[in-house]
């Protein structure tokens, strides 16, 4: 039993029963995954070389069976059968049926007949399906049946056919034939599907050549062929869609954040489950009310006007009362046409974003914002204490303790604006408001700017596609401002001593102090004009060069100087003269001899009113200014809970004694505001409703509407 195998058939089992290879009949050969006998075992028999060794020797020699891809094929002792060790590059067709019998039919490129194979999931190479050419000629690809007939039988097949076959062999052979039939059916289905795809492709190519193919439509963007009105409408629709989804996502994020904050707060409280559930239910009710509010469109008819409390270059501020709730607000009205004509679109958007994005006690709260065809409306909280300019007019000069209090609060307010990513650029006593408890809040962000694209004027210029003539005109105006001649001032060095002011400045006499008081009152009228006042603007802003948040610290130094000295550091009779003094601040910044201030106060002012690269707060921000010795002893965390130096006393919620309402009666409306008012009144008289605005002018104001969530629970709402 363990003798040599030299006299036996290598494919004949010792029992005389046909082996598995003989039972496969006409099935093609497959390369065995493992050798039939161990090499060491064969060497131990001491007989002639084993089949494995013979095959290894034959595979190492080049074969010449007219097979250019298979020089080292396997089983070369069997004629006309070559199985490559490495298959050539193939093209695959995937076939799948409901019985999960999947195959990939692979065909080698540029091969001769008989070299096509089918790769099954089991790794066997099976002959490919029969493919017929469309012209009726026989394809070089042969079917399994054809290949079996054309291939001459091997000596193993002849030997197996001469031997008697057992019933078990017949059953196994029948199963193999059934599998072959199934494979032939699958290949025929794949062939038919490939023929149908080929016919469809040929038909499509023919239709395209005849010019009758209309399966594809080619579009070209040609907005120049459309009218300007159509382009504006398309741009408006695009912005509305973007704003809708942006606001919806933002509201969902805020709603989820409010829920998480309340749950975190309730988890830290030792309350009963019933009380916690009531708090959650109350939040859900508020969310529902706010959702209805967002769907409600506010208008001017929802408010009753009480009186005018402020006027500006582009609008006015009124004291109003909401009809349904009776609460008092300050309504700021801006004329759309002036915003558009005076290139204030970016500033308007920045102001709205600052007020809407801030929930700080140092910034005026915005409750609603809406618009109509002519105006933009900002509904803000009403601060009955007036502004810092009113206090300066009444008290003339502050002590250092009072100045320290208000400057410390201004630092905290400016810090909040900077953390939001904005630059105010217009900090002055007029924009520092006093609340009912005497603490300050920043307002009027009409000149503020941020890092968002909608806060840049170039965004709106591109959006509105301004003509080149207007751009050139603006560039010429800017160039003229840069070419202003600087004043010929004497070359005086400032070694830190307090020198008297220059000859062309205001003299420090009692008579001139009375003139300064007159200047203060006229200063209010200057704020109402379109020119404005440059007393608190940093020099780098005038140069139209790059500047950062440090420009707001210059304004803080100018306000501090005015609180301690009694007038701004560079005040003059005309804005042009003020501009020249600011540009030469090294020579024009002087401290009077008859007014005593501490060394710390003067040092802080000088370190704020200096070049931007050396200015205090440029590198360390607000913390750098807080660390100055002038603010020694200030508790920055509880300063808003400290009693203010001055608390306004009011007789009613509509008391406006701290606002210059008497002066406003003598201030005429701007021509644009007067014309818009006449146009609105005329349209209302004719019962034609509010006049319709130009779609182009409405384009930059998409997304201006806003509603605050906690408008019902704000404690500072009157």
Curated annotation (Swiss-Prot):
Gene Ontology molecular function: ATP binding; protein serine kinase activity; protein serine/threonine kinase activity
Keyword set, alphabetical order: ATP-binding, Kinase, Nucleotide-binding, Phosphoprotein, Serine/threonine-protein kinase, Transferase
Biased composition (Polar residues): 20-56, 91-120
Top EC class of this enzyme: transferase
Recorded catalytic activity of this chain's protein: L-seryl-[protein] + ATP = O-phospho-L-seryl-[protein] + ADP + H(+); L-threonyl-[protein] + ATP = O-phospho-L-threonyl-[protein] + ADP + H(+)
Residue ranges constituting the AGC-kinase C-terminal domain according to the UniProt record: 632-716
Region annotation Disordered: where it falls in the sequence: 1-211, 470-497
The protein's Enzyme Commission number: 2.7.11.1
Listed InterPro entries: AGC-kinase_C, Kinase-like_dom_sf, Prot_kinase_dom, Protein_kinase_ATP_BS, Rho-assoc_Ser/Thr_Kinase, Ser/Thr_kinase_AS
Active site: 426
Binding site for ATP: 309-317, 332
Top-level taxonomic group: Eukaryota
Domain named Protein kinase: residues: 303-631
Compositionally biased tracts (Low complexity): 1-16, 57-68, 131-168, 175-209, 472-489
Pfam families: Pkinase
UniProt-listed PANTHER family: CHROMOSOME UNDETERMINED SCAFFOLD_135, WHOLE GENOME SHOTGUN SEQUENCE, MYOTONIC DYSTROPHY S/T KINASE-RELATED
Family named by the database record: Belongs to the protein kinase superfamily. STE Ser/Thr protein kinase family. COT1 subfamily.
Function: Protein kinase that seems to play a role in the regulation of cell morphogenesis and proliferation.
Name of the molecule in the record: Serine/threonine-protein kinase CBK1
Source organism per UniProt: Kluyveromyces lactis (strain ATCC 8585 / CBS 2359 / DSM 70799 / NBRC 1267 / NRRL Y-1140 / WM37)
